[in-house]
A protein has these predicted regions:
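Repetitive, compositionally biased segments used for assembly/scaffolding
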Residues: 1-54
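Beta-rich globular "head" domains
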Residues: 47-50, 54-105, 110, 131-138, ...
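N-terminal targeting/docking segments
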Residues: 9, 14, 19, 24, ...
Length: 150
């Protein structure tokens, strides 16, 4: 229920436990209600989540998925049973990037200011797809590791 999920989202102990559980996260990413309840909190538990996502019995990993095209808005994997973990951002010095969780396309999970080259990313978690927006010019993207629930 959404009430139960809201209670979990309000507890750091509960959030840490579910983020670290491949079984829980597999079920959550298949539920729109559950994702909406935790979308604003899950990025704080990225390290626990990445450990859980390594469970190949529950998730399939696709590494190096590029999303974004300069100053365009690009959606990827919206409404799919996925978790997107941003790992890097490439820019040629003239575009700012934002990524939003696919569950609502409004919860900002990452902001990267314009830079030259590839910058490592160590924050952010998107649930049920991702939206990437660029502000500026024509080149750039965010690279994600995408985990799909089996």
């Amino acid at each position: 229920s959404s009430t139960a999920m809201s209670a979990i989202a309000g507890s750091s102990t509960a959030m840490s436990a579910i983020a670290g559980s491949s079984t829980a996260m597999s079920a959550i990413c298949k539920s729109t209600i559950a994702c909406k309840a935790i979308v604003a909190k899950i990025s704080s538990y990225r390290s626990e989540l990445i450990s859980a996502l390594a469970d190949t019995t529950r998730f399939t990993k696709t590494a190096g998925k590029d999303v974004g095209d300069g100053a365009k808005t690009i959606d990827d994997g919206i409404s799919t049973n996925t978790i997107y973990i941003p790992v890097s951002c490439y820019d040629d010095g003239d575009t700012d990037f934002n990524a939003y969780s696919g569950i609502d396309q409004t919860t900002n999970i990452l902001s990267v200011t314009r830079h030259s080259g590839t910058a490592s990313v160590t924050t952010g978690v998107a649930l049920r797809g991702v939206r990437v927006t660029g502000t500026g010019s024509s080149v750039g993207r965010i690279t994600f590791d995408v985990y799909t629930a089996k």
